[in-house]
């Protein structure tokens, strides 16, 4: 059985993703601040829900080893939320990213998935935006998302 570690697993995307992974037979560990409440994730034999902060490197070093996959969803999402507290947004969306990637790599994680944002492409005239397009982020939120993509590219390999 594959073991999946998800940051932000009780958030908007994670609350939908986690039940699907559990239905598919994955063993899932969620690390989340649980700001929407701990009731978001239903009890399941293959679910370990941990209330915690991705900025806590000691906690990451304790939780990540033994998993096969990391799915990184945790962030202060969207521009308005980010702009309410830019320092908090930067600490979660950017500053915590490289340590998470490094801890994952050192823990022999086989795959690392990062949920970026289409906002990294800025405003395009083309009707279809795709990954080969130049990044043109316009706000701190999208700039930090783009920065994280670049950081992850530094660690990219066939076994990560």
Question: What is the predicted role of each segment?
Answer:
Residues 40-42, 80-87, 123-127:
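Conserved catalytic-core motifs of eukaryotic protein kinase domains, centered on the activation segment
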Residues 54-92:
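NAD(P)H-binding glycine-rich loop region in Rossmannoid oxidoreductase-like domains
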Residues 16-20, 103, 151:
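Rossmann-fold NAD(P)-dependent oxidoreductase module
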Residues 72, 98-139, 154:
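Conserved Rossmann-fold NAD(P)-dependent oxidoreductase catalytic core, especially the SDR/UDP-sugar
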Residues 140, 151-160:
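Active-site-adjacent segment of SDR/Rossmann-fold oxidoreductases
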Residues 144-147:
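Active-site helix of classical SDR
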Residues 1-69:
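N-terminal Rossmann/SDR dinucleotide-binding element
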